[in-house]
Amino acid sequence: MTLLNYLHCNRSKSFLFQRFYSPYRIAHKLFDGSSQRNATTSINHSISESLRRNSPARALSIFKENLQLGYFGRHMDEVTLCLALKACRGDLKRGCQIHGFSTTSGFTSFVCVSNAVMGMYRKAGRFDNALCIFENLVDPDVVSWNTILSGFDDNQIALNFVVRMKSAGVVFDAFTYSTALSFCVGSEGFLLGLQLQSTVVKTGLESDLVVGNSFITMYSRSGSFRGARRVFDEMSFKDMISWNSLLSGLSQEGTFGFEAVVIFRDMMREGVELDHVSFTSVITTCCHETDLKLARQIHGLCIKRGYESLLEVGNILMSRYSKCGVLEAVKSVFHQMSERNVVSWTTMISSNKDDAVSIFLNMRFDGVYPNEVTFVGLINAVKCNEQIKEGLKIHGLCIKTGFVSEPSVGNSFITLYAKFEALEDAKKAFEDITFREIISWNAMISGFAQNGFSHEALKMFLSAAAETMPNEYTFGSVLNAIAFAEDISVKQGQRCHAHLLKLGLNSCPVVSSALLDMYAKRGNIDESEKVFNEMSQKNQFVWTSIISAYSSHGDFETVMNLFHKMIKENVAPDLVTFLSVLTACNRKGMVDKGYEIFNMMIEVYNLEPSHEHYSCMVDMLGRAGRLKEAEELMSEVPGGPGESMLQSMLGSCRLHGNVKMGAKVAELAMEMKPELSGSYVQMYNIYAEKEEWDKAAEIRKAMRKKNVSKEAGFSWIDVGDTEGSLTMQGFSSGDKSHPKSDEIYRMVEIIGLEMNLEGKVAV
C-alpha cells in the first residue's frame, strides 16, 4: 500500500494526512504550472530563433507541429500566435488560417495578436483588411496605430491619419515619428513635420537617433539645407545613416553640390564608415557639378574601397560620365560591373549611339528585358535619314512588346518621324499613344510647324486646347507656325495671345519670345516691342528675338542700340544674335561695322561662323561693290559656298555688271543645283542688261533642255473678318484661278486710279 492510499484509508490519522497530502497537492500544482510555462517559452523561443535565422517556413512548421499535438492553450499563448503571424511574411493563405484560428480561440481580444494580424495583411498587400480590423479595435495601442500608418502609400491620406492620431491622444514613439516624417513631402507635409518637431521634446525623444535621422531626411527632401544641418549638428550621437541622410538629401536637391562634397570629406575625416549610399549620393552630386576631375577622384576612391563593381555605384558612375560625354569611361565602368541591370544597359545605349542597336541585341542576349527608357535611347540613336529603317524596326518591336502606347516612347517616335519629314508616321505614332499628355500634342504641333505644315499645326493646337491644358511650349510651337505662314491670318496669333494671357503664361520666356517673333514677322513691330518691354526677365533668347525683329524691319540704329544694351546687361550674344546684327548692317550698307561685328563674334565670343554668317558677309561686300573681297571670303568658307551664298554673289555681280565673275559663279551654282531656275534667270538678266543676246538665248535654251522653269511668285491678302477665318487668299501674277477674277482685276484698277488721285504711288 502506498503512502497516499494509506493516508486515505486511515482517516483517524488526520494530522498526518493534512501534514503530508496538502503540501503534495500544492507542490504538484506548482510543478505542473512551471512545466507548462517552460514548454510555452521553449516553443516561442524555437519559433523566434527560426525567424532570427530567416527561416519562416521552419517557424511555421514548429507552430503547426505543436498545434497538431494539441498543445495550444496549454503550451502555446498569444505570443506564439504573434510569432506565427510574423512568420507568414506575406503568405496570405496561411495568414488567413492563423487569423481564423485566433478569432475562434478568442485570442484576437489580445491587442498584440490583432496588431500581428494587421501586420500580416499589410505585408500580404491586403491593407483594406488590416484597416477594417483596426477600425473595430476597442482599445488600439500605439503599435496598432503605427501598423496602419506604415501601410499607406498616399502621402496626403497618411498625413490625415497622423492628424487623427494626434486628435486621439496617441503618445507617439520613435517609430511613429520616423514613419510620419517619411510622408512629410510638399509644402503641406513640411508644415506638419515642423509641428511634429515641436512635440518631440514633450515625448522625450529629441535625442533619439532614428527620430533625428528622420528629421534630417524631411528637411533635406524639402530643400531646407539649413534645417537639415541644424538637426544634424544638434544630435549628440550620429551614425552612418545620419551622415548619409544629410548627404543624400543635398545630392538630390542639386543646388548644394559643394556642401555635399564637403560633408563627404568630413565623413572621411571623422572616420565614418562609407557605404554604397555614401558613394552614390556624392557621385550624384558630381552630376550637378561641371568638375569632371572631382568625379574621377571619387571614382578612384570607389575602386580602392571595392564599391565600383556594385550595381548602384556602377550605374551612377556611368550616368555621370555619360552626361560629361566621356564614352570610354562609361564603357570602362560597364565592363567592371559584376552585375548589370536594365539601367546599366540603357545608359550604354544612350551614351553610344553609333553602336546602340548592337548593344541592345547584346542586352537581350544577356537576358535583360528593356523598359521604355531603353527604347527612348534606341529611338534617339537614329541620327540620319539612312538609319530610318532601323527606326521602323524599333517601332515594330515596340508594337510587339506593348511599349508603343507609353507616352515617352510615342513622343520619341513623333519627334523622330517629324525630323525626317515622315509626318504620316508621326501621326500614326501619336494615335498609338493610349494616354496623350500635353508633351505628345506639343511634339505633333512642333513637327508640323518645323516642316512647314502651318495649317495642320494650328488645327492640332485647337484640338489640344479642347482636350487638355496647353503649356508654354504648346503656344511657342503654334506661334512659330503662324509666324512663318503667310497664308494664315495674324488674327490667329492674336487669339493665341488672348488665350495664353488667360492662362497666365505671358511671363514665360518661351512664350514671350515666340509672341515677339510672331508679331515682328507679321509686320507689327510695335506689338513686338510692347511684349519685350512687359517682360520682367530677359534672357539671351528674348534679346535675340527683339534684335531679330528690328533687323527684319531694317531698323539699323535700334538693332545696334539693343545689341550694345544686351552686352551691357551681361547677356552673351549667340550665333543667331550675331546673324541678326550682321543682317541689319547688310541692309544699311554698313560694311565696316559688319566686319567689326563679324570679327567680334570670332575673337571675343569664340563663336565659329556658320554658312549663314559667311553668306551675309559675302552679300554685304557684294552689294557694296567689293566683289573681290567677297570672292576671297567665299573661298574661306568651310566646306565651300552653299547655293544661297552663290545666288547672293550672283545678284551682286548683276547689280555691278560684272559679267565675267557672274558667269563663273553661275556655273558653280548650276552644277550644285541644276534643277533650280534662280541661277539661270540671274545669268540671263546679266547678259540681257549688257545686251549680250546670244549668250542670253543660250541660257534660255539650256533651261528648256533641262526642263527648268521659272517658279511663279505668290502674294497673299487677308480678306476674312470673321471669327472662323483661318487662312488668307493667295494669288500670283496674271492669276485667274479665282471664280471672280474679272471683278477683282476691275476693282484693282479702280483702287489704282483712286491711289493716283490721292497722290499715292501703287507698287
UniProtKB/Swiss-Prot annotation:
<dbReference type="InterPro" id="IPR011990">
    <property type="entry name" value="TPR-like_helical_dom_sf"/>
</dbReference>
<feature type="repeat" description="PPR 10">
    <location>
        <begin position="371"/>
        <end position="405"/>
    </location>
</feature>
<dbReference type="Pfam" id="PF13041">
    <property type="entry name" value="PPR_2"/>
</dbReference>
<feature type="repeat" description="PPR 15">
    <location>
        <begin position="539"/>
        <end position="573"/>
    </location>
</feature>
<feature type="repeat" description="PPR 17">
    <location>
        <begin position="610"/>
        <end position="640"/>
    </location>
</feature>
<feature type="repeat" description="PPR 11">
    <location>
        <begin position="406"/>
        <end position="436"/>
    </location>
</feature>
<feature type="region of interest" description="Type E motif">
    <location>
        <begin position="645"/>
        <end position="720"/>
    </location>
</feature>
<comment type="similarity">
    <text>Belongs to the PPR family. PCMP-E subfamily.</text>
</comment>
<keyword id="KW-0677">Repeat</keyword>
<feature type="repeat" description="PPR 1">
    <location>
        <begin position="77"/>
        <end position="109"/>
    </location>
</feature>
<keyword id="KW-0496">Mitochondrion</keyword>
<dbReference type="InterPro" id="IPR046960">
    <property type="entry name" value="PPR_At4g14850-like_plant"/>
</dbReference>
<feature type="repeat" description="PPR 4">
    <location>
        <begin position="173"/>
        <end position="207"/>
    </location>
</feature>
<feature type="repeat" description="PPR 13">
    <location>
        <begin position="472"/>
        <end position="507"/>
    </location>
</feature>
<feature type="repeat" description="PPR 8">
    <location>
        <begin position="310"/>
        <end position="344"/>
    </location>
</feature>
<feature type="repeat" description="PPR 14">
    <location>
        <begin position="508"/>
        <end position="538"/>
    </location>
</feature>
<feature type="repeat" description="PPR 12">
    <location>
        <begin position="437"/>
        <end position="471"/>
    </location>
</feature>
<feature type="repeat" description="PPR 6">
    <location>
        <begin position="239"/>
        <end position="274"/>
    </location>
</feature>
<feature type="repeat" description="PPR 7">
    <location>
        <begin position="275"/>
        <end position="309"/>
    </location>
</feature>
<feature type="region of interest" description="Type E(+) motif">
    <location>
        <begin position="724"/>
        <end position="756"/>
    </location>
</feature>
<dbReference type="InterPro" id="IPR002885">
    <property type="entry name" value="Pentatricopeptide_rpt"/>
</dbReference>
<feature type="repeat" description="PPR 5">
    <location>
        <begin position="208"/>
        <end position="238"/>
    </location>
</feature>
<dbReference type="GO" id="GO:0005739">
    <property type="term" value="C:mitochondrion"/>
</dbReference>
<dbReference type="GO" id="GO:0003723">
    <property type="term" value="F:RNA binding"/>
</dbReference>
<dbReference type="InterPro" id="IPR046848">
    <property type="entry name" value="E_motif"/>
</dbReference>
<keyword id="KW-0809">Transit peptide</keyword>
<dbReference type="GO" id="GO:1905639">
    <property type="term" value="P:positive regulation of mitochondrial mRNA catabolic process"/>
</dbReference>
<protein>
    <recommendedName>
        <fullName>Pentatricopeptide repeat-containing protein At4g32430, mitochondrial</fullName>
    </recommendedName>
</protein>
<feature type="repeat" description="PPR 16">
    <location>
        <begin position="574"/>
        <end position="604"/>
    </location>
</feature>
<dbReference type="Pfam" id="PF20431">
    <property type="entry name" value="E_motif"/>
</dbReference>
<feature type="repeat" description="PPR 2">
    <location>
        <begin position="110"/>
        <end position="140"/>
    </location>
</feature>
<feature type="repeat" description="PPR 9">
    <location>
        <begin position="350"/>
        <end position="370"/>
    </location>
</feature>
<dbReference type="GO" id="GO:0009451">
    <property type="term" value="P:RNA modification"/>
</dbReference>
<dbReference type="Pfam" id="PF01535">
    <property type="entry name" value="PPR"/>
</dbReference>
<feature type="transit peptide" description="Mitochondrion">
    <location>
        <begin position="1"/>
        <end position="38"/>
    </location>
</feature>
<feature type="repeat" description="PPR 3">
    <location>
        <begin position="141"/>
        <end position="172"/>
    </location>
</feature>
